[in-house]
Amino acid sequence: MLTPWLELPGAADRLAAWSQISGLDLTTLGTTATAEEITDTAVTQPLVVAATLLAHEELTKRGHSAAETIVAGHSVGEIAAYAIAGVISADDAVKLAATRGAEMAKACAVEPTGMAAVLGGDEAEVLARLEALDLVPANRNAAGQIVAAGAVAALDKLAEDPPAKARVRKLATAGAFHTHYMASALDGYAAAAQSVTTSEPTATLLSNADGQPVASAADAMEKLVAQLTKPVRWDLCTATLRDRFQNAESAGIVEFPPAGTLVGIAKRELKGTPTRAIKSPEDLDGLDQL
């Protein structure tokens, strides 16, 4: 995930500093660690934020600014988005992601829960089936793409008997993220968020809660913490982008690493909008022509 970025001037030192802040060896975890090591949510979350911010800082060095852009991040990616939009510092973003990951890992250990993607089917029927099984639509990513979360036994029943014209794919997550199962992680995460110095956004920052721009730094931080137990409404973020793009002279979508999933959604939901998935420094070339 991080190997190509560490070849950039200053990147290794930056990551070393973030490793100290997070209490994790992000350099090793992002280069030579096994897949099993980095699937631990306590590791994955700060690693994802670090990867995003390394790429963004390189883009900034090349003269690009987030000002006058729209910024959004999915789930833990929202923390990185807050740093890109100037609400928190990059250092605090990594620290906050590490706390979030550690607290959520503890919550996941309380009882066996998980997540599964429900692809296709009628939305109303899918939601009704989830409710009947006491599952939560934890991520509503796009039309025909809802992520269910809850007890493992209920997810097994969903997979055995999916909604009509839908298929279920279990996800390799540690637990039922963005549901009430994460409630025990709230206090520790909230305390960490309250200790962070904030500034007003320098770019339009969309919230996972409702897809709308945050009103202020205080509003942003309140929503960020609350999002731990609430569904990610990426579908609403996409709807806001669609509305904004209709009146824009030019528009394009850039997804920072680890990239690919959100660009894939954009290609389906925002047809005709140029996109770029940034996976290595070379992908930053030519963004002016996007």
UniProtKB/Swiss-Prot annotation:
GO terms for biological process: fatty acid biosynthetic process. SMART domains: PKS_AT. It catalyses: holo-[ACP] + malonyl-CoA = malonyl-[ACP] + CoA. GO terms for cellular component: cytosol. The active site is at S75, H178. It comes from the Bacteria. Its EC number is 2.3.1.39. InterPro entries: Ac_transferase_dom_sf (IPR001227), Acyl_transferase_dom (IPR014043), Acyl_Trfase/lysoPLipase (IPR016035), Mal-CoA-ACP_Trans/PKS_FabD (IPR050858), Malonyl_transacylase_ACP-bd (IPR016036). Keywords: Acyltransferase, Fatty acid biosynthesis, Fatty acid metabolism, Isopeptide bond, Lipid biosynthesis, Lipid metabolism, Transferase, Ubl conjugation. Belongs to the FabD family. This is Malonyl CoA-acyl carrier protein transacylase. It comes from Mycolicibacterium smegmatis (strain ATCC 700084 / mc(2)155). The gene is fabD.
